């Protein structure tokens, strides 16, 4: 029975010492060079004495388990995607980052090139992750919530008005609202003045939290029509629970993905990957993948339906805001032969660092 029908632990238990060692050498050789390893070379690398014929017998058993395969006749063996998952779960050792590595990541991520310090930090994080991997570094940032600066209602027709919200960096959001029957221009102005007095300096999520308190104030300060108008304005600006979904993908190191392409088939897979990364739904899906675990998630090839056609691997971890809510993700995407044991702790540390720095910008 192959590994497809058994758990990883069952498969590990079924392998003896020499099978484990041969499998480990095949995977490590693939991760290092991308090239298949043959029985003759393997017999020279092994710590135990085994003839090429004995190595071939073990390789045949590993192939039956679905852990390795031969890319073409008379070639060595490469790990399958199932074999890579098996290796990552059962063999890979992820150590702690050295103080030097942590200092290097801190220095690169904190490197500020002017402008918005948070945006600079995200760009540097993406660039740094690209530099330490053979893939592309990515950062998904959540939609920022503007601090409210000014509110205005502009009548469009008797039953409709344009609700205008101006943020602290002069970003403008316009929403059309239905007007209560009989509302006057003076009541529009009165409602806007009330909101400017009570909402200025807050973000939309903060406004949402204070909705009930504002309603109490409205009852004391405004007439019925103005109260209705204020509540409609608050409701339309507060938006939906999905308002904070990711809005931007920062990706660096796309050129890394061009290295080692073997032909038209590899180029087609890369094109599919780039197409996937341009889709808004893909960003949401990546963030959803990051949210499903407590730390770093590893998706190899077809395990992740998002990039299954391109055969890419994704290593991703979420970062959080002051309220411990997941607001974005950092990671690396690239070929399946990424250096997982080195990249995983770096993605993990980078996510923690971005969480800290986004709460307290540079």
UniProtKB/Swiss-Prot annotation:
InterPro entries registered for this protein in UniProt: GAF-like_dom_sf, HrcA, HrcA_C, WH-like_DNA-bd_sf, WH_DNA-bd_sf, WHTH_transcript_rep_HrcA_IDD
Keywords: Repressor, Stress response, Transcription, Transcription regulation
GO molecular function: DNA binding
Biological process (GO), any one: negative regulation of DNA-templated transcription
Transmembrane segments: none
Coiled-coil zones: none
Presence of keyword Repressor: yes
Family from the record: Belongs to the HrcA family.
General function of this protein: Negative regulator of class I heat shock genes (grpE-dnaK-dnaJ and groELS operons). Prevents heat-shock induction of these operons.
HAMAP family reported for this sequence: HrcA
The name this protein goes by in its record: Heat-inducible transcription repressor HrcA
Origin species: Rhizobium leguminosarum bv. trifolii (strain WSM2304)
């Amino acid at each position: 029975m192959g590994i497809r029908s058994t758990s990883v632990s069952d498969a590990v238990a079924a392998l003896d010492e020499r099978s484990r060692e041969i499998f480990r050498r095949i995977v490590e050789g693939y991760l290092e060079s991308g090239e298949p390893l043959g029985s003759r070379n393997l017999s020279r690398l092994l710590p135990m004495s085994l003839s090429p014929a004995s190595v071939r017998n073990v390789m045949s058993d590993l192939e039956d388990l679905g852990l390795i395969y031969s890319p073409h006749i008379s070639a060595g063996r490469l790990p399958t995607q199932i074999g890579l998952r098996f290796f990552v779960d059962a063999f890979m050792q992820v150590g702690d980052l050295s103080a030097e590595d942590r200092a290097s990541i801190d220095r690169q991520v904190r490197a500020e090139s002017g402008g918005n310090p948070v945006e600079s930090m995200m760009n540097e994080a993406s660039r740094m992750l690209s530099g330490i991997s053979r893939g592309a570094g990515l950062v998904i940032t959540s939609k920022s919530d503007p601090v409210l600066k000014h509110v205005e209602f502009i009548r469009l027709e008797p039953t409709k008005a344009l609700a205008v919200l101006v943020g602290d960096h002069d970003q403008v959001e316009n929403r059309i609202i239905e007007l209560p029957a009989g509302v006057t221009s003076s009541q529009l102005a009165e409602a806007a003045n009330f909101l400017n007095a009570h909402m200025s300096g807050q973000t939309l999520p903060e406004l949402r939290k204070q909705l009930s308190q504002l309603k109490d104030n409205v009852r004391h300060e405004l007439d019925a029509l103005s109260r209705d108008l204020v509540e409609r304005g608050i409701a339309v600006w507060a938006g939906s629970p999905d308002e904070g979904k990711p809005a931007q993908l920062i990706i660096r190191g796309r050129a890394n993905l061009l290295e080692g392409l073997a032909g038209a088939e590899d180029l087609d897979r890369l094109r599919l990957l780039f197409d996937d990364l341009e889709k808004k739904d893909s960003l949401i899906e990546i963030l959803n993948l990051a949210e499903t675990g407590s730390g770093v998630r590893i998706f190899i090839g077809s395990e992740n339906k998002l990039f299954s056609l391109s055969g890419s691997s994704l290593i991703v971890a979420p970062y959080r805001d002051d309220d411990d809510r997941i607001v974005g993700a950092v990671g690396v995407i690239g070929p399946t032969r990424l250096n997982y044991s080195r990249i995983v702790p770096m993605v993990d540390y980078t996510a923690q660092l971005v969480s800290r720095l986004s709460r307290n910008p540079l």
